[in-house]
Amino acid sequence: MSKIQLNGKKVVIKSNYSLLDLLKKYKLANKKVAIELNGTIIQKTGYKKKKLNNNDKIEIVHFIGGG
């Protein structure tokens, strides 16, 4: 198990979790999102291969349309 900080909240996840796994867990995999991992913006093409580590800080922002 790994402890991470997700949008300012402490969360425990399984070891060897990827950013894509995290998005699936929170039902955001099919949404338009931007992800910052430890201060660096991660490109969408890297979500599957980027593994999360203990004490990582992740910010996920998803876009909502409106008028």
Where are the language model's segments positioned?
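Compact, glycine-rich, soluble single-domain proteins
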Residues: 12-47, 51
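Eukaryote-biased recognition of intrinsically disordered, low-complexity regulatory segments
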Residues: 1-8
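Glycine-centered recognition micro-motifs in short, flexible terminal segments and loops
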Residues: 66-67
